Regions:
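Acidic donor-binding loop of glycosyltransferase active sites
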Residues: 94-95, 256-272
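Glycosyltransferases and closely related glycan-assembly transferases
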Residues: 22, 47, 83-96, 103-119, ...
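Donor-nucleotide binding loops and adjacent catalytic segments primarily
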Residues: 35-43, 173-261, 295-298, 310-319
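Conserved nucleotide-sugar phosphate-binding/catalytic loop shared by glycosyltransferases and other
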Residues: 5-6, 26-73, 311-313
Length: 363
């Protein structure tokens, strides 16, 4: 049996892909070779998927994103549909497993027109436009959070939670001193505005903290070069600053093990992992995320007692260091006060069982 995996958060998708592969399914991955339009560096998604020897098919899909690169994105919309059509005709998969996002939209709809069964997974607390459209042709809709169920036909919805990479629970501490450690991340692509704010206060930050900084792999801003230049200028303090473009699966467990708290965007995957690991966080939602989903994700973590929201506009006020110090001083106030309502069974096992049920049904 052939299965195509496509769409959003590749860490979760990769968990499902690997489990399917172990069961004997032939896996094909439709994804982004580069993180952003115009980027010259290969994405973490491409590197991690190909490292698992999974065939990778690049889809140059476009999205309706009014704030930047509108015409470039718009021109890619028909390209994404055409590439999906050609690739699906060639592979002839028995199932498409979507993890949402604009790349999955053309794959799912072309698959539906070619009579290929589609299932999809929604990672966020509120559904994005792409998954709402994919849901119209999906046989089953897996959701991470109960709050997103209202966006879909109830007879299709199955609460699974989020498939988690086991590596986040495995690792060792990266620093031997008594200072608290902050993990700063804007995701695999990085967040230039967060990086810039951190660079301005980094010497002061390192007087009190160890800093683990995932600054992103995009070559458009080349923040890693600036980070390394700053690190070189820090002298002995540089020993307390660990910076990389991104942390691979084999490294992320040690990052989380070391971190006393996290400063990050509020993507669904990040928020879910922080909840499971009971890690306090300062969350900086992307202001332009679809349906304001990142702010909603952040609000959920605040309601659980683990987070404080810092809006991106506030980064420009120049008091980020003060906010970090205050958060650190009150770290004991940020503890998980209640648990998410989730199935006890791991999400990936529920998803695999539901997939195999589709294969057992008469076509």
């Amino acid at each position: 049996m052939k299965v195509v995996i496509c769409g959003g958060h590749h860490n979760s998708a990769l968990v499902v892909a690997e489990m399917l592969a172990k069961k004997g399914y032939e896996i094909f991955w439709f994804g982004h070779r580069f993180s952003m339009i115009g980027d010259k560096k290969e994405s973490a998604e491409f590197l991690e998927v190909t490292a698992k020897k999974i065939p990778f098919i690049e889809i140059k899909a476009g999205k309706f994103q009014p704030h930047s690169r509108f015409w470039q994105n718009l021109s890619r919309v028909p390209i994404g549909f055409w590439q999906s059509f050609v690739s699906l005709l060639k592979i002839k998969p028995d199932l498409i497993v979507s993890f949402g996002g604009y790349l999955a939209f053309p794959v799912a709809w072309i698959g539906y027109l070619l009579r290929i069964p589609v299932v999809t997974h929604e990672q966020t607390t509120v559904s994005g436009l792409s998954n709402k459209l994919i849901a119209k042709v999906a046989r089953k809709i897996f959701i991470t959070f109960p709050s997103s169920a209202k966006s879909f036909p109830q007879k299709k919805v199955i609460l699974t939670g989020l498939p988690l990479r086991k590596s986040i629970f495995e690792g060792k501490k990266l620093f031997g001193n008594a200072q608290k450690t902050i993990y700063i991340t804007g995701g695999k692509q990085g967040a230039h505005v967060i990086n810039e704010a951190i660079f301005k206060i980094l010497p002061n930050l390192l007087e009190k903290f160890n800093v683990i900084h995932q600054c992103g792999s995009t070559s458009l801003f080349n923040d890693i070069k600036k980070a390394e230049e700053i690190k070189y200028s820090l002298g002995r303090a540089s020993e307390n600053y660990l910076v990389k473009e991104y942390f691979f699966d084999s490294e992320i467990g040690s990052v989380f093990k070391s971190a006393d708290f996290v400063i990050s965007r509020a993507g669904a995957h990040t928020v879910y992992e922080l909840t499971v690991l009971n890690k306090p966080a300062i969350l900086i939602p992307i202001p332009w995320s679809n349906a304001n989903e990142q702010e909603e994700n952040a609000k959920m973590l605040v309601s659980l007692g683990l987070a404080k929201i810092l809006f991106q506009a506030d980064l420009e006020q120049g008091n980020l260091l003060e906010k970090i110090l205050t958060f650190s001083d009150h770290l004991n106030d940020f503890k998980l006060r209640k648990n998410l309502v989730l199935p006890k069974e791991p999400a990936e096992e529920i998803i695999i069982r539901e997939i195999e049920e589709i294969f057992s049904l008469p076509s």
